[in-house]
A protein has these predicted regions:
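Generic recognition of stable, solvent-exposed alpha-helical segments in well-folded globular domains
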Residues: 3-10, 28, 42-45, 57, ...
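Metal-dependent nuclease catalytic regions and adjoining charged, substrate-binding loops involved
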Residues: 85-165
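A non-catalytic, helix-rich entry segment at domain boundaries
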Residues: 1-32, 36
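Short, surface-exposed helix-loop/turn micro-motifs enriched in polar/charged residues
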Residues: 4, 21-25, 41, 69-72, ...
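Non-catalytic protein-protein interaction segments used by genome-maintenance enzymes to assemble
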Residues: 28-88
Length: 165
């Protein structure tokens, strides 16, 4: 436990140094959102940080994982951009000019950024629709794994966790 506390402290110190050196124009933190795709898929969540930049708005998602990944392949970031691109009742709207994964443990290159095009966002929307349809039709082969520990749905609709009566 002490080891993790020390790691957390060091991560926060490094993050604070970076922010002080290059302060962002933060317009929202933990920004709640809720929207639907085709009025039958409902998505909600919170965007870690939204900044105002010279080029528009920028979405940042903080990550504590040890292995950095590419923003371009991150569906979570794309969902944030999808929401903002179609938001009408929010004070913050419009397709973000960039979206970034901020890897807090990464000292050299903490950011992985990507600007999602409209075509990419439409592709993500179609992927979500296809996955949702397959889930509704029970056309998937769920695989139990370590990731199941964080799944909110395992006891609601996952066949791998159904109890036999």
């Amino acid at each position: 436990e002490e080891k993790f506390r020390e790691q957390g402290k060091n991560i926060l110190i490094e993050y604070a140094k970076r922010i002080i050196e290059n302060p962002p124009t933060v317009i929202s933190r933990e920004h709640p959102f809720e929207f639907s795709i085709n009025n039958n898929i409902f998505i909600r969540g919170k965007i870690d940080r939204i900044d105002q930049t010279e080029n528009g708005i920028s979405v940042i998602d903080y990550k504590t994982s040890k292995t950095p990944s590419l923003a371009k392949k991150n569906i979570q970031l794309a969902v944030y951009c999808l929401y903002l691109s179609q938001a009408v009742e929010d004070k913050i709207t419009g397709t973000p000019s960039s979206s970034s994964l901020y890897f807090l443990r990464e000292l050299e290159e903490p950011l992985s950024s990507h600007s999602f095009s409209n075509d990419e966002l439409n592709n993500i929307k179609n992927i979500i629709l296809n996955i949702a349809e397959k889930i509704r039709q029970n056309l998937f082969d769920p695989k139990k794994g370590y990731h199941c520990n964080w799944c909110d749905y395992k006891h609601l609709l996952c066949p791998k966790f159904e109890t036999k009566v």
